């Protein structure tokens, strides 16, 4: 069974866990309709990406 050879100090433990926290999702306003959308992704509301219609919106 695996057992740690030495005690891990609180500083090392904190450094290891530094990237474990959840990140806040980034959102931007769509230039076409104003709805919130993920950056570098098509707007799911109007179907536009980078000023062009990529997908016709399903109504």
Curated annotation (Swiss-Prot):
InterPro entries: Ribosomal_bL32 (IPR002677), Ribosomal_bL32_bact (IPR044957), Ribosomal_zn-bd (IPR011332). Signal peptide: none annotated. GO terms for biological process: translation. Transmembrane segments: none annotated. GO terms for molecular function: structural constituent of ribosome. One of its GO terms (cellular component) is large ribosomal subunit. Residues 1-16 have a biased composition (Basic residues). Keywords: Ribonucleoprotein, Ribosomal protein. The keyword Ribonucleoprotein applies. PANTHER family: 50S RIBOSOMAL PROTEIN L32 (PTHR35534), LARGE RIBOSOMAL SUBUNIT PROTEIN BL32 (PTHR35534:SF1). NCBIfam families: rpmF_bact. Belongs to the bacterial ribosomal protein bL32 family. This is Large ribosomal subunit protein bL32. The lineage of its organism: Bacteria, Pseudomonadati, Pseudomonadota, Alphaproteobacteria, Sphingomonadales. The gene is rpmF.
